[in-house]
Amino acid sequence: MLRGLRVVVSGIALAAFTLAGAVVASAQEPAKPVLTLDGDAAVITFLIKPDKTADFESVVAKLKEALGKSDKAERKSQLAGLKFFKSPQQVNNSAVYVLMVDPVVKDQEYDITRLIAEVFPVEVQEVFLKYKDSFAGRAITILNKVP
């Protein structure tokens, strides 16, 4: 009986040690970005369900607000390089929004919901659902300057 108890206690101690090590490792290494842009500039085309354009535009507004309120200088630089446009034309029965990024801030996160989560962690789930429900497609074009 005592031997079985030692095995259980040892197992719990090992699990706690492993978990503590994982927490320390994650605290030391910031999360790697899920979407970086590698060129000098980029054009991101979003296809949005036509009845969800107001929802998507509220996501864009929240993104701009998050970048503007961030304490990180890189986020301010990202905001300065973003320009959103809406096309009067539709593609595949979807509204077309174009995000021009010029210049790209190298090695930085460009995933919309992750950027919003940095500043608005409580609201991000609601924003994500609006984004997901409005989304019909996306294309990313990386651009490099021609000498």
Name each model-derived stretch:
Residues 17, 46, 56, 84-85, ...:
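Phenylalanine-focused residue identity feature
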Residues 63-81, 93-94, 100-147:
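An amphipathic, aromatic/His-enriched active-site/gating alpha helix that lines ligand/cofactor pockets
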